[in-house]
Amino acid sequence: LSPSSAASDVYKRQILPEILIDLMEVRNMTIRKAEEKDIPRIIELLGQVLQIHADIRPDIFIPGTTKYTVEELTELLKNKEKPIYVAVNESDVCVGYAFCQLQKQPFSNNMLQFKSLFIDDLCVDQQARGQHIGESLFEHVKKEARKMHCYEVTLNVWSGNTSAEKFYEKMGMKTKERQMEYILDNL
């Protein structure tokens, strides 16, 4: 008997990538929770991400800065509801990260109660792109979200960051809602 088309699609989208990712991890990369020793590299990568955002929105982002300081990262590493996962190479050097936040949708009159794992930031070192590190990190986040009994994995992407949009769509993500703006010119 051959599997149904729907079951085959599920296999291709969910099970097969995890098998391939697991094989990759054994060969040359590991994904683990971030540790204090990773902070200097994470700061470097945060700078790369901020520069991408500053290039897209110079009216909002300040070039040459990072989202977090060393002290803030040290505190974040202690927060179990905001896990940071790092992809490290065979020399245990961080080549990518995923900052996550466990979010709980409380019950209300119009919405069911559920948990989400929000990807606050995902980055792969610009020198290491094209090696499927981003895919590995994303699959790892999905696996962790399942362990936490989350309903979904969510994130935000800045308009204009087309490479990120394409990557997340390739990973199976769909637009859930859009945040829109009207910039006032009175400043």
Predicted regions and their residues:
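Conserved acetyl-CoA-binding loop-helix of GNAT-fold acetyltransferases
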Residues: 124, 130-143, 170
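Single conserved hydrophobic/aromatic residue that forms the stacking wall/gate
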Residues: 1-14
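A short helix-loop-beta-strand connector motif used in the catalytic cores of GNAT acetyltransferases and
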Residues: 71-86
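Conserved GNAT-fold acetyl-CoA-binding loop/helix
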Residues: 50-73
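Conserved GNAT acetyl-CoA-binding A-motif
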Residues: 146-156
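Conserved beta-strand in the GNAT
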Residues: 86, 93-101, 123
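Conserved beta-strand-loop-alpha-helix junction that forms the acyl-donor binding cleft
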Residues: 154-164, 181-183
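A short beta-loop-alpha structural element at the N-terminal edge
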Residues: 30-44
